[in-house]
């Protein structure tokens, strides 16, 4: 994901170059460039060399160059890789604005929170599309939470050792650390068993809460099942 524009040209010069490459007539060129500059929010950087921009502003410039000829479909390969959280959110807000104007985006990402923002999500594993649907459709797949099971969030101290304890229980199918808690796939109605087993192992006041699966749960479950085949 290297910066693909010309670092020794200014923002305006890069946009002018791409407008000419895409065949935008001279009489319309300046107006269209000003439109994409405003849309990408890079008005204050017209004369800045592209190579001197931060990661987030480089991505905005790259998007502006790609939009200058009014495409209806765009492919974005990890567009937020290497940029800070604020720039990442601002870039996604820009993509939503463009989507509302009729532009369709195909986005590749390793960030599951970004996948949650998409209308449809496809998982590719070893170059094969293994599933595709809306985020809600994927979370409701029987393969993700098989009948008779439930996904639970377990809040307790010493997560690594608690995870090892639960992983050995016959009623637990899967357990992983997720931020400051454990995500557990277990038999339905096993909340009290989890609390009792952890309390017996020295974990008082354990909280066990039913939760819906996340897209990360979907991704991990699907890939693990295929690794086991």
Where are these regions (language model features)?
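Hydrophobic anchor residue at the start of the ABC signature
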Residues: 63
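Conserved catalytic motifs of ABC-family nucleotide-binding domains
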Residues: 70
